[in-house]
């Protein structure tokens, strides 16, 4: 899984934030672009844990070690597929999730944890940029209407299939 010594070879590095005075004037991304080689290095930091506590710390049970490995290897399209295997809305969770997975990261016991949230966001951004992620509206319309009352984001994922009817 990944680079065997990646967690020793690379330090945690986050994409820099845009200046606040610039951000208050627009709705653009908070973080600046991050070069692919740095993203791959962050994916390489993921250790081959016997028990991936990051995965159990994730509310949607993302296959975090798997897609971190795919990032390290530069296999972005497969990473998109792997991410969507457990998460209907990675474009949201990669931005607004408080990332309990990072708090559960085994590397975090002795060093700063893997940049899981940043990696997730960049997988989904790459998927949209490359055209691998596209809307999938239903080809058959019944004419019926569905109302979904959501108390919070946690209820969106199980109801997402209803939105394609």
Language model region names:
Residues 141-165:
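N-terminal Rossmann-like FAD-binding beta1-loop-alpha1 element of flavoenzymes
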Residues 1-145:
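Ferredoxin-type iron-sulfur electron-transfer modules and their immediate structural context
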């Amino acid at each position: 899984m990944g680079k065997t010594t990646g967690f020793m070879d690379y330090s945690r590095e986050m994409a820099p934030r845009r200046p606040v005075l610039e951000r208050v004037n627009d709705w653009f991304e908070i973080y600046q672009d991050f070069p692919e080689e740095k993203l791959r290095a962050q994916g390489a930091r993921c250790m081959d844990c016997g028990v991936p506590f990051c995965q159990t710390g994730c509310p949607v049970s993302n296959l975090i070690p798997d897609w971190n490995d795919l990032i390290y290897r530069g296999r972005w399209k497969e990473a998109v597929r792997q991410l969507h295997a457990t998460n209907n809305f990675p474009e949201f969770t990669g931005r607004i999730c408080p990332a309990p997975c990072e708090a559960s990261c085994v590397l975090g016991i002795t060093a700063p944890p893997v940049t899981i949230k940043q990696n997730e966001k960049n997988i989904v951004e790459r998927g949209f940029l490359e055209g691998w992620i596209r809307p999938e509206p239903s080809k058959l319309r019944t004419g019926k209407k569905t109302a979904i009352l959501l108390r919070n984001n946690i209820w969106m994922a199980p109801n997402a299939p209803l939105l394609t009817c």
